[in-house]
Swiss-Prot record:
Coiled coil: none annotated. This is 4-carboxy-4-hydroxy-2-oxoadipic acid aldolase. Belongs to the LigK/PcmE family. It catalyses: 4-hydroxy-4-methyl-2-oxoglutarate = 2 pyruvate; 2-hydroxy-4-oxobutane-1,2,4-tricarboxylate = oxaloacetate + pyruvate.
Length: 238
C-alpha cells in the first residue's frame, strides 16, 4: 500500500470503517490516553493545532491529497464523506495557503462530517468556530487557492509526519491529533480503557493526599540516582 502514497487522479469510493461505538469510546478517552495506550505512536506533529478550544472529535479518516495552493480535491472528497467522518488533508509539498473556509465547512456539515485535520492552512477561522465546525490545522492564512491540479481521495497519505489510511480512526482534541490503525482499533480501545481505569484509581489516591513519590515507588530509584535530602541549606556548607 505504501506504493500508493503520492498517487494522483484516483478516488476510492468504498473504505473500511470501524464500528461507531468503538470510535466514540476512543474519542471519550482522548488523545493523550489513546497515544499512550498504543505505545506512543500515531501522534501528528504539534504544528497541527486546534483553531478552537474545548472541542473533541473522533471519526473515520477520509484522506485527501492536494497540490500546493489548490483545493480542487476538497470538492471531490465531500461526495465520498459519510456521517461521522473526519477529513484528513495533506499537500503534496509544504504549503500554508488557506485551502478551507466556511463554504466548504457548510458542505461537509451537510454530510455529517465531524471535522477537518489539515497539514496546511485554513481561513474564515472565526466563522468556522461560530459554525461549530472543528478544525486542526498547521496555519491560519487568508491566502486563497486555485482549482487546477488533480490529487487523490482515500489513498494512503503522510499527514504531519504520520501515515494515515482511509478508514483509520482520527481522535482529536485540545492536545492534538492521534491516528489509530483501522485493524488495531479493538486492541487500542482495550488498552486505553485499562489505562483510564488505572489513572482514575491513582487520581483518587492523589486526591486523598497520597504522594506520587509513593504511588509510583520512586524513592528507591531516586536514591539510586544519587538524590539526597538536606534539612537546611547550611547543611551543604563546608
Amino acid at each position: 500500500m505504501s506504493g500508493l502514497i503520492g498517487k494522483t487522479g484516483i478516488v476510492v469510493r468504498n473504505i473500511p470503517r470501524v464500528e461507531p461505538h468503538m470510535i466514540d469510546a476512543l474519542g471519550r478517552l482522548g488523545v493523550a490516553t489513546v497515544h499512550e495506550a498504543q505505545g506512543r505512536k500515531g501522534l501528528l506533529n504539534t504544528a497541527v493545532r486546534p483553531i478552537q478550544q474545548g472541542v473533541a472529535v473522533a471519526g473515520s479518516a477520509v484522506t485527501v491529497l492536494v497540490a500546493p495552493g489548490d483545493n480542487w480535491m476538497f470538492h471531490v472528497a465531500v461526495e465520498q464523506c459519510r456521517p461521522g467522518d473526519v477529513l484528513v488533508v495533506a499537500p503534496s509539498s509544504p504549503c500554508s495557503d488557506g485551502y478551507f473556509g466556511d463554504l466548504l465547512a457548510t458542505s461537509l456539515q451537510a454530510r455529517g462530517v465531524l471535522g477537518l485535520v489539515i497539514d496546511a492552512g485554513v481561513r474564515d477561522s472565526q466563522t468556522l468556530r461560530d459554525m461549530g465546525f472543528a478544525v486542526w490545522s498547521r496555519a491560519i492564512n487568508a491566502q486563497g487557492t486555485v482549482k487546477e491540479v488533480l490529487g487523490s481521495v482515500n489513498l494512503p497519505l503522510l499527514c504531519a509526519g504520520q501515515l494515515v489510511n482511509a478508514g483509520d480512526i482520527v481522535v482529536a482534541d485540545d492536545d492534538g491529533v492521534v491516528v489509530v490503525r483501522h485493524g488495531e482499533a479493538q486492541a487500542v480501545l482495550e488498552a486505553a480503557t485499562q489505562r483510564a481505569d488505572l489513572e482514575e484509581r491513582k487520581r483518587l489516591r492523589l486526591a486523598a493526599g497520597e504522594l506520587g513519590l509513593d504511588i509510583y515507588e520512586m524513592r528507591p530509584r531516586l536514591a539510586a540516582k544519587g538524590l539526597r535530602y538536606v534539612d537546611h541549606l547550611t547543611d551543604l556548607e563546608g
